[in-house]
């Protein structure tokens, strides 16, 4: 029996698995494992690339958000991306190495549905440096978008997926130190944390109607604030503080023995794939 015959019989075995069971298996796997299964057979590939399966996976994954760590190792010119859950950070842990080109400047932002914004089943990828948009399923090409925003100023910018326009959101008037402020998700609303002159941490939340650009100051949350050191400790740890319960807990992450770390919250894994045409040589 040759190799092709063995592979054919194996593919036939997979095809006999009921579709409902196959989908349930896929929904429980890490996104990286699902990506590898595309090469098992055309049958598996057609199931995994189905838009409905992607949405089901994303819905389930959204209930178990993860932490994403960006660790820089200057001596190796490398960055490592670590994905970890809060429930079992040491045992449920993924690591991916990324080679850096130090002729370029890198900025790391919290992920939003991976790297993709979705609107009415149209998937649009935004290349902010050049004001370009790529819409999947359309003409498969980058489109230039006009932007008159002054990028020399530190700004909070929104992008309207319907009108494809950039707009500047004004910061709260009482926030003086913008550079030390951070954007957070407050019950689905845009929120800004900033240190006041008296050393307290203020939480500013944008009202429901974002077009009015009105902020209110709040101190309660059903979630937690994450406090993490900028530089690696041995072992690396961060503090989760529950504003409602006024309690804190320490979470230790093993194996981050490098130089610099940046922590992003609410990372959600997704098996959504980008077509090769939307990626440049540097991506």
Curated annotation (Swiss-Prot):
Taxonomy, superkingdom: Eukaryota
Coiled-coil positions: none
Pfam families in the cross-refs: F-box, FBA_3
Domain F-box: 11-60
InterPro entries with a match to the protein in the record: F-box-assoc_dom_typ3 (IPR013187), F-box-assoc_interact_dom (IPR017451), F-box-like_dom_sf (IPR036047), F-box_dom (IPR001810)
Protein name, UniProt field: Putative F-box protein At4g29970
